[in-house]
């Protein structure tokens, strides 16, 4: 399927079109976890659109799926979103060859762009090794590429976790259009990234508290992917409003809304502590907060991080504190909203 841009036009296209907030979308499964739940996935795409987000990032690496299932998941997301919002895909498969196959699949089914990183087991031997492998993958596709520095074994090259001398070189690759700063990294890394390559590509810090600096001072125009649906609903799209107000220069109004969300940010804080050291980003806490605010929910296959009761209670308490009512019943989350409406329930086993 034809892209909206040519490879040589990708940077110019992104500057004009990548604006607003991007959120991740995770796979949904049938209650027995045997198949993808296409209706549930489409429900989430439509709920993301109703919230006012401008892009959805399909995250097929977040749980156990075959490679063909991952491709099918991407195809469903792209098809449902087509012509309404941008679609991206987190491309961090097991091998470079799989990454290239996924990039070609995204281009074939009509995805907008790709967020390209490396699998958590990737072990570069040198700084040049990182660059050459990355360029090799970018050269294989016409897709616009967002460079993702997270989850790499690169602290041995620089204490910022990524060798800064590579940023301008990667930004010079023709179809690299943006860089995503890893969530939870130092603000110094964000400033360094803007200073080194924002004259060539977009720089994207997904952390909301930093937007009050990065938008007015550095010109950030697009943020994510982040689970911003965990703090808003279509009726009260507060995260979208914060970013839009900052883009308009109305910082005081944006700050007022930001402080309204303080209790939710405090309640959700620390949910990532149990999995950051593994390199595996669990889908369950994000799927749970999305379900609480109207998403499909549904549990996912192993391997994935555990969703503890205390985490769910922190999410629900945070939502109540900012005037939102978490969805009930809890059983609906585990089988998925669409399946629950069809009569699906958790199985009970008796000896």
What is each of the regions a protein language model found here?
Residues 213-351:
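Structured C-terminal cap/extension of enzyme domains
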Residues 20-22, 202, 285:
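Generic structural signal for residues positioned in beta-strands
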